[in-house]
Regions:
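Membrane-interface helix starts
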Residues: 13-16, 45-54, 222-236
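A short amphipathic helical element positioned immediately N-terminal to and/or at the very start
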Residues: 38-45, 112, 213-226
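Hydrophobic alpha-helical transmembrane segments
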Residues: 51-55, 82, 86, 123, ...
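Membrane-embedded helical hairpins/re-entrant loop segments and their flanking transmembrane helices
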Residues: 64-91, 252-270
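Membrane-interface interhelical connector segments
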Residues: 192-225
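Transmembrane helical segments that form the transport core of multi-pass membrane transport proteins
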Residues: 221-274, 281
């Protein structure tokens, strides 16, 4: 695994991905069409300063992803600078959308390879980055749910029906990946299953590649997880990242005059459940599951037009603006790589 070819998608693939994004956006607009006048009116209440503040909070998400990436990669490359960690986060954000949900790790692995980290360890470290993110999502939602369960059960019992599925998916991913990383018996089982793949052509190449990735994943996980202070710092960064992300709906309620008496921590709970439940729903390039979960959670507390307005505010700041910034970040990161 020593490819240094750029992961930049072809023009055709880029246009296809952007077309899918535009189609999904069009579907959302079509669904909201009966309330579009109210949504537009609510968004028009935002001042320039409020809009810029919301964008800044939304952009904190990929920037903190970059800090986490920096902390993780420094376990193998001690002189890896913070700016390159942020560049790596832009790679992941841009790749996730352009790759329709499957491009994050390949883009980041390629970037780290160009910065001196072999592909195998790069895949291992970025997989562990994903584990830390999922763990933070699980912990954040669980702590707030334990504190606020009586309140949400009294006001929105429908959401609670989806929590077992969300816990099964998120906890299953975490336990499965940690077991694959740390338990020799699971690693042996995975190797045994891989040997059932066809022994010819591209399947043979894939099997060898996956076996190599499995070995490096085991090595990198043992190395990183043994550094307890570093792991605590990484998890802490992810928790701060989620806290700031979940501030956006509270800001939207205040800025657009949609306040319904929800406290700051109640909004934090509702938004954490939105992200948590979305993990149990299918999505394309990060769209679909969040929108569905958001309306499911907030519909018990806001009228339809208000919940849709808040959703548009939230996604404009946390998804569309972030993707646009990642396109710029991706281009600048490639330029810096080409300059050496």
């Amino acid at each position: 695994m020593r490819s240094s070819a750029s992961p930049a998608p072809s023009r055709r693939k880029t246009l296809l991905s952007l077309g899918v994004l535009a189609l999904l956006t069009g579907i959302v607009v079509f669904i909201f069409r009966e309330h579009w006048a109210e949504i537009s009116e609510a968004l028009s209440r935002l001042t320039l300063g409020q809009g810029l503040l919301a964008l800044a909070v939304g952009l904190s998400y990929p920037l903190l992803e970059g800090v986490s990436s920096w902390l993780i990669v420094r376990s193998r490359l001690p002189h890896f600078p913070l700016r390159q960690g942020i560049d790596n986060a832009w790679m992941g954000t841009f790749g996730n959308v352009v790759g329709l949900g499957a491009g994050s790790v390949p883009f980041q692995t390629w970037y780290l390879h160009r910065r001196g980290l072999d592909v195998g360890p790069g895949v291992g470290l970025m997989t562990l980055q994903y584990v830390f993110h999922k763990t933070a999502v699980l912990l954040y939602a669980t702590v707030l749910l334990l504190a606020g369960r009586p309140w949400i059960a009294a006001h929105s019992d429908g959401v609670l029906r989806y929590l077992p599925g969300a816990y099964a998916v998120v906890a299953g991913v975490i336990v499965g990946l940690i077991a694959l990383c740390a338990l020799p018996v699971v690693q042996r089982l995975a190797r045994w299953l891989l040997h059932f793949l066809p022994d010819t052509g591209r399947w043979a190449e894939r099997r060898e590649s996956w076996l190599e990735q499995l070995d490096t994943l085991s090595t990198e996980s043992r190395h990183l997880l043994a550094d307890k202070p570093r792991c605590a710092a990484i998890l802490g960064v992810h928790l701060v990242k989620l806290f700031l992300l979940f501030c956006l709906p509270w800001m939207g309620l205040r800025f657009m005059g949609l306040d319904t008496g929800l406290t700051f921590w109640q909004v934090q709970l509702l938004t954490s459940l939105t992200l948590f439940v979305s993990n149990a729903l299918p999505n394309v390039a990060g769209m679909g599951s969040v929108e569905t979960a958001f309306l499911l959670v907030y519909s018990s507390f806001l009228p339809d037009a208000s919940s849709m307005s808040l959703l548009m505010f939230y996604r404009l700041a946390s998804y569309y603006a972030v993707f646009a910034a990642s396109a710029v970040g991706f281009a600048l990161a490639q330029r810096r790589l080409n300059r050496g």
